[in-house]
Curated annotation (Swiss-Prot):
Function field: The pyruvate dehydrogenase complex catalyzes the overall conversion of pyruvate to acetyl-CoA and CO(2). It contains multiple copies of three enzymatic components: pyruvate dehydrogenase (E1), dihydrolipoamide acetyltransferase (E2) and lipoamide dehydrogenase (E3).
Reaction equations catalysed: N(6)-[(R)-lipoyl]-L-lysyl-[protein] + pyruvate + H(+) = N(6)-[(R)-S(8)-acetyldihydrolipoyl]-L-lysyl-[protein] + CO2
Main enzyme class: oxidoreductase
Alphabetized UniProt keyword annotations: Chloroplast, Metal-binding, Oxidoreductase, Plastid, Potassium, Pyruvate, Thiamine pyrophosphate
Binding site for thiamine diphosphate: E61
Record's keyword annotation contains Ribosomal protein: no
Protein name per the record: Pyruvate dehydrogenase E1 component subunit beta
Gene name in the database record: pdhB
Major location (coarse): plastid
Cofactor(s) this protein requires: thiamine diphosphate
Assembly and interaction partners: Heterodimer of an alpha and a beta chain.
Molecular-function GO term, any one: metal ion binding
UniProt key word Chloroplast: yes
Binding site for K(+): L114, A162, I163, D165, N167
Amino acid sequence: MLHKLFMYEALREAIDEEMARDKRVFVLGEDVGHYGGSYKVTKQLHTKYGDLRVLDTPIAENSFTGMAIGAAMTGLKPVVEGMNLSFLLLAFNQISNNAGMLHYTSGGNWSIPLVIRGPGGIGKQLSAEHSQRIEAYFQAVPGLKIVACSTPYNAKGLLKAAIRDNNPVLFLEHVLLYNLKQEIPKQEYVLPLDKAQVVREGSDVTIITYSRMLHHVMQAVKQLVAQGMNPEVIDLISLKPIDLETLVTSVSKTHKAIIVEECMQTGGIAAEVMAQIYSHAFDELDAPIRRLSSKDVPTPYNGYLEQACLVQPTQIVEAVKTLMST
């Protein structure tokens, strides 16, 4: 049985099911309770589970993130919502020094089963401070898993897996994908956190991407196929750890790769993916890896300039054609 849900509804369904399944699961963050969350992911959950399991907090990311880590240390399973993931920079100390490292620094005595989730990425004129690509900042934190959903289907299955995981998971939801609608199973399903997905099989070139850029890539693929090319498309999903096996298998087949990301180029996810492929599949490559990233500038408020910062489908088409000609 299938039903059609928006992504924000699929995320809510995942949280609802996990709260019903495990009484240790609770939600906390700014306006997650009576207001239902900034994008309505937690709407009406406080009515069902009460104010102690859907906990409204003050506007103090460092405080409630630290509280969630402490709760996780005692055996609870907190799900933190960042009203905007850019604000998690205010809790960088708690996430890096506590959530990411406590299992190691305690000699394995502490586990931190914590999910930190919320809207991020470049939206519609949200300007610089609300358009951070935080995956670049957090990818170097030891002990932290990073997952980026791209569809209602994988959003639900991945969030359920993240809540059940015994490690801290940073769960990235793109602000412009909340209203993406898709048929998903009514019956329970859980997806692996550490596996990339081959979205489209092909033989000519491997296009690696994640989150909202998957949809830009798929627009470009329509044009490439119409021009006689057969690209393979991989949705990374797991940004940390990277599913290297899937990437190497694909590159060993196509012998050419291009990475498309919304992250800034300097220190971005693509830089790490390139390094991993070069380290493990260099001899399989017939050409240097290409990458398309956002500009290394603060995201402008002006709509035209904002779009100029982003990778567009036409740029992907041209980059793939150039790569194919080498």
